[in-house]
Amino acid sequence: MQLCIALDLPSQEENLKLLESLVGLPVWIKVGLRSYIRDGKEFLGRIRQIDPRFELFLDLKLHDIPNTMGDAAEEIASLGVGMFTLHASSGGEAMREVAARLARFPRRPLAFAVTALTSFGEEGFREIYNASLESKALDMAMLAAQNGMDGVVCSVFESQRIKSYVAQDFLTLTPGIRPFGEPSGDQKRVADLHEAKSASSDFIVVGRPVYKHPRPREAVEKILEGIA
């Protein structure tokens, strides 16, 4: 299991200060919409300057027509990031196009398809998809696997079911991790480290429990110890 730290602080300066406290730790750094829109691709270079060993995860959750998604995937791959996200609900054709574009790169990023955001509960999910969250997440995961994606973004509670349904080596990336029993906030489907390990999550994402901790490095070290 690998750890991704979400950079969700209000300013670039605060995010960089957080990163400076984590130098030398074996973590992925997740750059989401807020940071990328505000700070641009130059921000990725600043992260690398702080510690070139940080692995970069660009979490933009692409969702568009196939050609546009393919173009975006090529641009993302050219940035040299290690992984990125798109929505499985963009469809099989769009995911096939992304996979085909990525195949042009000798060293390409991992592509993860989002099934159901962890902010969804069952009721909210049904309002949009008119289906149960678990069954639809399984179907989306299979669609993603059949169309060239490396894995899916899902909650811990779907992770092992998806692996059993698709393949044990199909990757799962699970947000909504509350390692020290923190409040769930705007997330509906949250889990602790033990649950993530039991569900065979390949990557976990932790944000607020790290950057709101008075000693972020200590928090990350404890998480790394817990998933070792």
Curated annotation (Swiss-Prot):
Lineage: Bacteria, Pseudomonadati, Campylobacterota, Epsilonproteobacteria, Campylobacterales
Catalysis: reaction(s): orotidine 5'-phosphate + H(+) = UMP + CO2
Record GO terms (molecular function): orotidine-5'-phosphate decarboxylase activity
Protein name: Orotidine 5'-phosphate decarboxylase
Gene3D superfamilies: Aldolase class I
Any one Pfam family match given in the protein's UniProt record, by short name: OMPdecase
GO BP term, example: 'de novo' UMP biosynthetic process
HAMAP family, sorted: OMPdecase_type1_B
Subunit structure: Homodimer.
Principal EC category: lyase
Top-rank taxon, per record: Bacteria
Protein function: Catalyzes the decarboxylation of orotidine 5'-monophosphate (OMP) to uridine 5'-monophosphate (UMP).
Family: Belongs to the OMP decarboxylase family. Type 1 subfamily.
Active site: residue positions: 61
EC number: 4.1.1.23
InterPro entries: Aldolase_TIM, OMPdecase, OMPdecase_AS, OMPdecase_bac, OMPdeCOase_dom, RibuloseP-bd_barrel
Listed NCBIfam families: PRK00230.1, pyrF
UniProt GO cellular component terms: cytosol
Species per Swiss-Prot/TrEMBL record: Wolinella succinogenes (strain ATCC 29543 / DSM 1740 / CCUG 13145 / JCM 31913 / LMG 7466 / NCTC 11488 / FDC 602W) (Vibrio succinogenes)
SUPFAM superfamilies: Ribulose-phoshate binding barrel (SSF51366)
Binding site for substrate: 8, 30, 59-68, 118, 178, 187, 207-208
Primary gene name: pyrF
UniProt keyword annotations, A-Z: Decarboxylase, Lyase, Pyrimidine biosynthesis
Pathway stated in the Swiss-Prot or TrEMBL entry: Pyrimidine metabolism; UMP biosynthesis via de novo pathway; UMP from orotate: step 2/2
